[in-house]
Amino acid sequence: MRYDDYAGGQMAAEQCMEALDGKEDAQVIVFEEEPSIASSGRRVDGFTDWMKENYPNAEVIKNRSTDRTTDGCYAWATDMITAYPDADAFFLYWNECTMGTYHALQDAGKTDVYVIGYDATDEQKQVMIDGGEDCKLYASPGMSPAKMGVKCVEFMEQIFDGSYTRSGADDIYEMTPELLTIQNAKTFDINAMDDGTTEETEDAEKDTAEEIDTTEDGQE
């Protein structure tokens, strides 16, 4: 089981072009995939494939730094916006690079350049809330540990009762990424379940039910 990183990259590309109002000749800088990290390749491929299919005249520039820390990405983004002063947007496939790039562009006075990130972290969410509708950290797909945990339990139950048998190594269940945007930042909860509850709420309800059962047993 894993999140569909390719779909996440496509979501990021779609959000990027939404931010740019469908600019046909947009110039977008992408932090190039790291060969040793499979998910980075899927995210970048999803982004670039979607761009090629939907905006063939857009220029997508792939480049990367050997320093993947927040500070390293800050320096990288500063160099990239200097080399490509007309860039319209950046796509970064993990949180540290997202934040490093965002702050680099802000500090460089490039406050009209959009940033599409990844991981949908609380840090990114707060930047969006503080920036409001004009925030240039526009969107960020991400993964919900709680939802993945729930799905894992469901599959374990199916395995134990014999209703599910894996067909092979390629039989991988992929979950659709969550999407944090400037439009939903104030209400976004990456761990919210489809029924509106969160894992914490469900745990609390379970604990309460167990306490009631214990009380009833004691009364008997």
What are the language-model segments listed below?
Residues R2-G9, I37-S40, V44, T66, ...:
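Solvent-exposed, acidic/flexible segments
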